[in-house]
């Protein structure tokens, strides 16, 4: 019963992590305008993402434009685009594998050992996906903070951490926890299987011991008669 609850929790966290990974990938709020010094008065608000940048001026709705070329991105955003696309695919594969490894799923048969190994694989992929999400998010955040405190960079070009980065950190944590739960399910199944197989052997040993203990008694009586 405990392993079933862990499976449900792991699948839920994995699904949330998968949706969060896709959301972080498509969100344009990776870098947002920093309102400091002469830029305190809000005339323009800039968002920079992996696929587009958006500008909102005073009394004008936000306008977004897709990047004309990959080279228009900074190196950290270029790497982030590739890693986040890979993470989206990996999270989807891990989620589908987790569904196949659930005990309530019948399409993979009733072999619990096979399902346990499928869940273990899904858990490992979830953990790796969480690390893949964590790398570009932390990389971009480090670049933003470094430029923010760099006196050479113009104030108008300085940016702050966007909502996508905070969501990325949360998503990475959720994916890692979900994968860890699936690994715990595998460990619990292995322990229960080893315990289940050790009990009959112990009983058989006791039975053979009692049989061997009675046989000399029978033999001595027949010899006496």
Curated annotation (Swiss-Prot):
Region: Disordered, residue numbers: 206-225
Tissue and organ expression note: Expressed in the epididymis, mainly in the caput segment.
UniProtKB keywords: Cell junction, Cell membrane, Membrane, Tight junction, Transmembrane, Transmembrane helix, Ubl conjugation
Compartment(s) of residence: Cell junction, Tight junction; Cell membrane
Cysteines joined through disulfide linkages: none
Transmembrane segments annotated in the record for this chain: 8-28, 82-102, 118-138, 167-187
Residue ranges annotated as Extracellular topological domain: 29-81, 139-166
Family annotation (InterPro entries): Claudin, Claudin_CS, PMP22/EMP/MP20/Claudin
Segments on the Cytoplasmic side according to the record's topology features: 1-7, 103-117, 188-225
PROSITE patterns on file: CLAUDIN (PS01346)
Annotated membrane topology: Multi-pass membrane protein
Gene Ontology molecular function: identical protein binding; structural molecule activity
Modification after translation (UniProt): Ubiquitinated by the BCR(KLHL3) E3 ubiquitin ligase complex in the kidney, leading to its degradation.
Cellular component terms per the entry's GO annotation: apicolateral plasma membrane; basolateral plasma membrane; bicellular tight junction; endoplasmic reticulum; plasma membrane
Catalyzed reaction equations: chloride(in) = chloride(out); bromide(in) = bromide(out); iodide(out) = iodide(in); fluoride(in) = fluoride(out)
GO biological process, one term: cell adhesion
Region entry Interactions with TJP1, TJP2 and TJP3, spans: 224-225
Function: Can associate with other claudins to regulate tight junction structural and functional strand dynamics. May coassemble with CLDN4 into tight junction strands containing anion-selective channels that convey paracellular chloride permeability in renal collecting ducts. Cannot form tight junction strands on its own.
Quaternary structure note: Can form heteropolymeric strands with other claudins. Directly interacts with TJP1/ZO-1, TJP2/ZO-2 and TJP3/ZO-3. Interacts with CLDN4; forms coassem. Interacts with KLHL3.
Annotated family: Belongs to the claudin family.
Protein name in the entry: Claudin-8
Species of origin: Homo sapiens
